[in-house]
Amino acid sequence: MSQVTVGENEGIESALRRFKRSVAKAGIFSDLRRIRHHETPVEKYKRKLKQRSRNRRR
């Protein structure tokens, strides 16, 4: 779960931007899309390939 604390002098727009960035980095939307729709074997292979390359970079 992504969580962002808003500073005293920080605007809501910048906090929302930081939240969206953290959600994208965590991969929450891609997981949601995968759960809601049927995933073909080719899509599954491509997703796992991307995940492997992401893990190698870390």
Curated annotation (Swiss-Prot):
Record's keyword terms, sorted: Ribonucleoprotein, Ribosomal protein
GO biological process, one term: translation
The name this protein goes by in its record: Small ribosomal subunit protein bS21
Top-rank taxon, per record: Bacteria
Family to which this protein belongs: Belongs to the bacterial ribosomal protein bS21 family.
GO molecular function: structural constituent of ribosome
Family matches, as Pfam families: Ribosomal_S21
Gene Ontology, cellular component aspect: ribonucleoprotein complex; ribosome
Source organism (scientific name): Synechococcus sp. (strain CC9902)
Gene3D superfamilies linked: Ribosomal protein S8
